Each structure stands twice: as C-alpha cells, then as structure tokens.
C-alpha cells in the first residue's frame, strides 16, 4: 500500500479524519521552516501539503503569497526545497508528503526530471494548481512513471462528467475545493458538498480531502460530516507564522496548540 492508503486505512479503523496542514517550504527561513514542520507533525498532523515558492502564485490568497515572498527573500530555491524534502523524508519515513506546485516549476527543469527528483526525495503526491485536468496528460504520465500520485482539484460545481474523469485518474486523494477563488477565507460556513463526496466514492475515486477556507475546528468537523476523509488547512497555519515572525518560540507554541485543536475535531 502507498503511504496515503496506509494512512486512510489506519484512520478509518480509528474513526478519525485526516488533518493535513499546508506550509510553504523555507518560510520564513529554511531552518525555522523545518522546526515549524516538526511542530505540525508532533502536534498531530496526519500528512503534509507543502508549497515550493514561486514568484507568481495565482491560486493563493495574500497570506500564502506573503509566505512565498518571505521564502524567496530568504534565498529558497527549488533545489533547496528538495534538500529540505529529503531531510523530512528521512525523519518521517511513513508520513505522506505532498507538493502543491505551479506548472512553471515543473516544466522548467523538464517534466520527467522534476518527477524523478520527487521520487528520489520520497514525495508521495504532486498537485499542480494551474494545470486543468484536460491539460494534465504529460504531467500525469510522468507521475505514473515515477510512482508519484497526481492530485486533482474537484471544484464545488463539478458536473458528473468531471467527477467521472476525476475518479478515473485519482490516486492518493482528491482535493475537494470548498469554494472557487483563491486560498484563505473568512466565511465561517462551508457549503454542503456531500453530493460530491458520495458520487466520487460511488465512482471508486481516491478519498477526498477538503481544502480552501478551513480555519476552525467546526469547519474541520463540517468537512468530515460532508463525507470528506479529511481537511487541509493552509492559510490559517501560515497566518500564525506571519503573526509571530519576531518570536519563533511563541510561533511554534501557537502552531502546536492550533494543530492539536484542529486534530481533536477529526475525532469528534
């Protein structure tokens, strides 16, 4: 079984959902980034979704854009990110680790080269935010060659044709969007998406993880009650980093408390 399959099977037995935080690699510095990720994992994160800094992050809201800028200003490059990823894989051999990318960072070194490096670093999945399903063939093929799960976005207005395509191609998990737009939101209520999770499950799709706007334990619970296997929280995590840039010990303490509270909601 893959790491994702092992995780979802384990959580299902325990009647828990998955909590998957997102952070940008190297934010605010490479060394502190590793400490942040340690805090997330030690506090209950079931898997990680990690971003490689890119100068034009179209799908990201201002919070994650700022994180990207901080990492770039700290000199973080894709090369440095792969070094960090290799360190994380060695430290956490069973933890599912996914990348959330933009196509330029995959195309520039060569699609085949990029996925080969992912496999060498022990990456479980890659989601390319700006490549729609209908343009994904070369990326999907390379991912398959190197045993990396290609992750696809399921929008809240997906029709049945798209759901069938997602189910047929899905591996690892399906990223279920709470809403359209960019990451981060102050909306307290998530739209009901059980019709999507139910249909995807009936079609044999990989488990769904719901993201975009997941900032509170109640929203985690809402995602799980709607049939998602877990929740991805990014902007809320990155916002805590931004608020405590000058006081790293307090930052790490706040992150631990947040993850513990969010993870507790997966067990309710």
Swiss-Prot record:
Q: What class of enzyme is it?
A: lyase
Q: Which GO terms describe its molecular function?
A: tryptophan synthase activity
The record's EC number reads 4.2.1.20
Q: Which InterPro entries match?
A: Aldolase_TIM (IPR013785), RibuloseP-bd_barrel (IPR011060), Trp_synthase_alpha_AS (IPR018204), Trp_synthase_suA (IPR002028)
Matching entries from Gene3D superfamilies are given as:
Aldolase class I
Cite the PROSITE patterns for this sequence: TRP_SYNTHASE_ALPHA
The record ties this protein, via SUPFAM superfamilies, to: Ribulose-phoshate binding barrel (SSF51366)
Under which pathway is this protein filed? Amino-acid biosynthesis; L-tryptophan biosynthesis; L-tryptophan from chorismate: step 5/5
- What keywords would UniProt list here? Amino-acid biosynthesis, Aromatic amino acid biosynthesis, Lyase, Tryptophan biosynthesis
Reaction it catalyzes: (1S,2R)-1-C-(indol-3-yl)glycerol 3-phosphate + L-serine = D-glyceraldehyde 3-phosphate + L-tryptophan + H2O
Q: How does it assemble?
A: Tetramer of two alpha and two beta chains.
The entry's family comment says: Belongs to the TrpA family.
Q: What is this protein called?
A: Tryptophan synthase alpha chain
Question: What species is given as this protein's source?
Answer: Edwardsiella ictaluri (strain 93-146)
